[in-house]
Structure formats: C-alpha cells, structure tokens
Design a protein with these regions (language model features):
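Aromatic/hydrophobic pocket-lining residues that form π-stacking "cages" and hydrophobic walls in ligand
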Residues: 56, 137, 210
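Non-transmembrane, amphipathic alpha-helical segments
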Residues: 41-44, 129, 202
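Generic alpha-helical secondary structure signal
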Residues: 23-30, 111-114, 132, 201-204, ...
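Terminal helices and disordered tails flanking the catalytic cores of nucleotide-processing hydrolases
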Residues: 3-6, 10, 145-231
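Acidic/His-rich, divalent-metal-binding segments that scaffold phosphate/diphosphate chemistry
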Residues: 2-91
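Divalent metal-dependent catalytic cores for phosphoryl transfer on phosphate-bearing substrates
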Residues: 37-38, 48, 61-176
Length: 231
C-alpha cells in the first residue's frame, strides 16, 4: 500500500518518542486534564493520549499502511487533546493551532505537519470527522477509549451520566480484522450502573463518527454491547 503522503518517507522526521518528551506538549496535556477535572470531565491525561496513539497506530499497521503514516498517527494521537488547556469548547481546533506552532520546531515536512494538524483539528464529533486515514485512525482510537479507569476518584453518589457510562464498562476490546476489513468494538456494560439507553445517549454520535472513520479506511465499524450487535 502506498503511503498517504507519497514520496516523503525518505526524509528524516521527528518521532513519536520526541513528541512524548516535549515539555510544552506534556504541560499542555497536564493543564488540560486538570481543567477538565475541575469541570467534572473524565480523565484526559497522558495515559489516555498514549492509548489513543497506540490504538491509531495499531489500526493503520493492521491495514497495511507504511510506517511513516503509522508514526504520524502516533504523533497526532498523543497531541490530540492539547487544546483542552485553552478551553474544552472547540478544543480540537485550539489543539490544531497549538500543534502547528509546536511542530514548526522540528525537522518535519510541511505536508506531514499539516496532516497531523488536520487530524487533531477534526477529531471532535461536534465539529469534525475523518478526512484522511491518519484522522480516521485517531478518531477510532479516541472514541473507543471507554473504560472504568477513566472515571476520576470521587464518591459514586456524585457521578454524572458520563461517569456512570464509563464506570459501567467492565470490559472493552477493539478487534481489527484486516482480511474482512472490519473494526469491532465489543463492550460489557453493567446495566445496574448504567442503562443501555444512557450509554447510547452519550456515545451514539461518537460511535457513528467511528463508522464514518472506518469507512474512510475502507472498512466497516461494528459495535457489540453485552453480546448484542448494535451497529
């Protein structure tokens, strides 16, 4: 399979390791996560960003994309939530603007920088969508990160619907079938904590965004909850 950014694989570019050790990126992520904690949101820490980066990379690797594109997905995945340091509203666009300036510090081609910035800017379901394979993999990595450990430590009596939905997920697996071109998210949800209705009230738009992202990759997105096919 040809690289998404054809002809630039030979250039010496920055790496995922470089961006993970970038002080400005990490301070933006820490500040954004602290802000969201005070506003009552679930965890958006570096652990979430690493998970998104690795999932995005795994998806592209399974579908045969070159290492160059996989590395771009890792970088975009790690940086995708830096805009939360400015404001949660339109954080994707803020993140893209911040990333553009940070990436100018590196020996990175203009097409690669724009690809990363575009993926970050389009990852939020309220304003964006998949525009290329890098952004598609990032979206799926981000929107499928539903797990109990993303709920911050607080009394259960104070949980809002977002807390309950994440806390109710007792098991989550994302499977990639490259041969059949299928991306499957399988969830186990404790319905004593959160009803199926509540889950889909919060996550339906995100799951539909995953379906669009899978389509960009020439694949089908399937969602199973408690053994029942949903999408």
């Amino acid at each position: 399979m040809l690289s998404f950014n054809k002809g630039i694989e030979e250039q010496k570019n920055m790496t995922y390791k470089d961006i993970k050790h970038n002080e400005e990126v990490n301070e933006l992520l820490k500040k954004g996560n602290r802000n969201l904690g005070l506003l009552g949101y679930t965890d958006h820490s570096q652990a979430h960003c690493v998970r998104v980066a690795e999932t995005a990379a795994h998806i592209l690797k399974k579908f045969g994309y070159p290492e160059h594109d996989i590395e771009l997905a890792r970088i975009a995945g790690y940086m995708h939530d830096i805009g939360n340091a400015i404001n949660r509203s339109r954080h994707a666009e803020y993140g893209g603007l911040l990333a553009n300036e940070i990436l100018k510090q590196y020996d990175l081609s203009i097409p690669d920088r724009i690809t990363i910035v575009s993926a970050i800017s389009n990852h939020d379901e309220s304003t964006g969508g998949a525009v290329d394979p890098i952004s598609a993999a990032l979206i799926i990595g981000d929107k499928t990160d539903v797990r109990r450990s993303r709920v911050r430590e607080k009394p259960k009596a104070t949980f809002d619907i977002h807390d309950r939905v994440n806390y109710a997920v007792t098991d989550q697996t994302l499977k990639i079938n490259a041969e059949k071109k299928v991306i499957s998210l399988n969830l186990q949800i404790d319905t004593d904590i959160c009803s199926m209705y509540e889950y889909f009230e919060i996550f339906l738009q995100r799951m539909l965004m995953c379906r669009g992202a899978a389509d960009m990759l020439g694949a089908t997105f399937k969602l199973t909850a408690n053994g029942a096919k949903v999408l």
